[in-house]
Amino acid sequence: MFFGIPGIILVALIYVLPARADIYMFIDTNGVIHFTNVPTNAETDYRIFIKEKRRKSLGADSEKRYDHDYDHYIAEASERHGVSFPLVKAIIKAESDFNPRAISKKGALGLMQIMPENLQILQIQDPFDPWENIMGGTRYFRMMLDRFKGKLPLSLAAYNAGPTTVDRYKSIPPFKETEDYIEKVMMYYYSYKY
C-alpha cells in the first residue's frame, strides 16, 4: 500500500473535519467597514469579528445547510412585516443559499445579504445572526414593497440593485445580474409556494 494506515487516516480526517470560517473586519480611512474570512493585507488592522466555533462533524453531510433550518425565523419576520413566507424564503435562497456567514464581493452580509450601510437603519447589531438578519432583511424588503407600491418585480430589483437605481430607470434596471436575480427569486418563490 502506498499511503499505509497513516495515509488512510489523514484522507479520512480531511473528509470528516469541519471547515472553519472566522470573520474579520476592519474600518478603512473613509470609515467604511469591511468584512472578510481571509485577511489579505498584513498592513491592514483586521480584528476578529466572529470566531467560528468548532463543531462536531459526522461527515460531509452534517455541514450542509438545509432550507428549512430558519423557517421559524422566516415565519416570525413574515408575520411581523407582512411579507409572504415563501417570498422571504426565496430571497434568502437566492441571496445566500441559506449560508448565515455569506459575504458578497460587494460586502453584503448574512442570509439576506444586508449592505453594511443599512445595518443601523434596520437595527441589526450582528449581521451574521440569522434572526437579526432575517428580521432586518424582511423589514428592508417591506420598505421596498411600500416604496414601489407592491410591484414585486420592481421591489426585487430595488432589493438587488438599490432603490435609487430603480428610481433612476423608472423600471427594472437593464442589468443582467438584476434581471437574473428577479427570475431566480420568482422561480424559488413558486417552488416554495406550491
Regions found by a protein language model. Name each.
Residues 1-69:
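N-terminal secretory targeting signals
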